Regions:
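Active-site donor-binding loop signature of nucleotide-sugar glycosyltransferases
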Residues: 35, 120, 171
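Structured loop/turn residues at beta-strand edges in well-structured enzyme cores
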Residues: 64, 113, 144
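Conserved N-terminal subdomain of the carbohydrate kinase-like
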Residues: 1-70, 85-89
Length: 177
């Protein structure tokens, strides 16, 4: 269900799509949610893994020496498989969400032990650590592996924690979202 014209749009912008795999008989991953008025809180209404349920990534040879790797929000076992195919990235960044905390906790902890950066929202940081204070949550997350912790705060921007340092990036206030 991924039309060729979408791929053409990417290649037309000179983007390398060598690593894209298309399963003709499968449906794309689907997530549906509802954001509250503050745009910080969300409710997951549906998560359908579809083709990602049995996805086995094959990282193209030309990508394996990448210095920066962003592990997309996929099952932690898929993320571990990608890590195993990389040669020696300088920055290994993890994106995850509450779904994986609820369905693949042990595997998620294994991934976290291997990465040096994690990007997570405030609600998920609290869920992951059991801490309400984001400073304490970031410290606990660092103890799990990543030495750089990015906590996204929706309309309030984001926080970057590294050892004792904290960097705050405010959000740009918008009249309409």
């Amino acid at each position: 269900d991924f039309p060729q014209n979408h791929l053409d749009l990417l290649t037309g912008k000179n983007l390398n799509i060598q690593g894209i795999e298309i399963k003709a008989d499968g449906k794309t991953f689907f997530w549906q949610g509802r954001y509250h008025n503050d745009m910080n809180t969300r409710d997951t209404l549906a998560t359908e893994l579809n083709v990602l349920a049995d996805f086995k990534p094959v990282v193209p040879e030309s990508y394996r020496s990448a210095e920066v790797v962003l592990l997309g929000n996929l099952h932690p076992l898929v993320q571990l498989d990608v890590i195993a195919q990389m040669t020696d990235p300088k920055i290994l960044m993890l994106d995850t969400m509450n779904f994986w905390m609820e369905h693949a906790w042990d595997d998620l902890l294994r991934v976290m032990a291997k990465v040096n950066v994690i990007s997570i929202n405030d609600e998920e940081a609290r869920q992951l650590t059991g801490e309400y204070s984001l400073v304490r949550a970031a410290k606990k997350i660092s103890e799990m592996g990543p030495d750089h912790v990015i906590i996204k705060k929706g309309e309030h921007g984001a926080l970057l924690f590294h050892q004792q340092d904290v960097f705050y990036a405010p959000a740009l206030p918008l009249e309409e979202v």
